[in-house]
Structure formats: C-alpha cells, structure tokens
From Swiss-Prot:
Annotated region described as Disordered, given as residue ranges: 1-22
GO biological-process terms attached to the record: translation
Name the UniProt record assigns to this protein: Large ribosomal subunit protein bL32
GO cellular component: large ribosomal subunit
Source organism superkingdom: Bacteria
Entry's family note: Belongs to the bacterial ribosomal protein bL32 family.
Disulfide partners: none
Basic residues composition-biased segments: 1-18
A single MF term (Gene Ontology): structural constituent of ribosome
A Pfam family reported for this protein in Swiss-Prot or TrEMBL: Ribosomal_L32p
Protein keywords: Ribonucleoprotein, Ribosomal protein
Gene name, Swiss-Prot/TrEMBL: rpmF
Length: 62
C-alpha cells in the first residue's frame, strides 16, 4: 500500500480542495410563463402549480 513520504502542507491541501469550488454554479431561476413568479427550471411552479402549460399540482382556492 502506498504511503506518502512527505506530509502535505496546508497550502497544497487547501489549493487542491479549492479547485472544485468554481465547478459549482449558481442556482438558475427563471420566470413562470403563467404567473411570472420565480421558479427553478424543470420544476412545477409553487404559486400556480403549472409545469409546461399543464396544471400538475392542484392549488387550494382561497
């Protein structure tokens, strides 16, 4: 089994871990075409319950 000959410094360790931070992207938000509320892509709207022009979540009438 391979064993490291030298201890990994904090700087080298942190630099290696920081390399993956730029791969994460910010959360995408679009507008619902029906009610214009912000909604995440490929998900039903939480305010009107529609997805791709169809009502997929029944909303309670107030």
């Amino acid at each position: 089994m391979g064993v490291p000959k030298k201890r990994t410094s904090k700087m080298r360790r942190d630099r290696r871990r920081a390399a993956n931070n730029n791969l994460r992207s910010a959360v995408q938000v679009t507008k619902c075409p029906n009610c214009k509320e912000p909604v995440m892509p490929h998900r039903a709207c939480t305010s009107c319950g529609q997805y791709k022009g169809r009502e997929v979540v029944a909303q309670a009438e107030a």
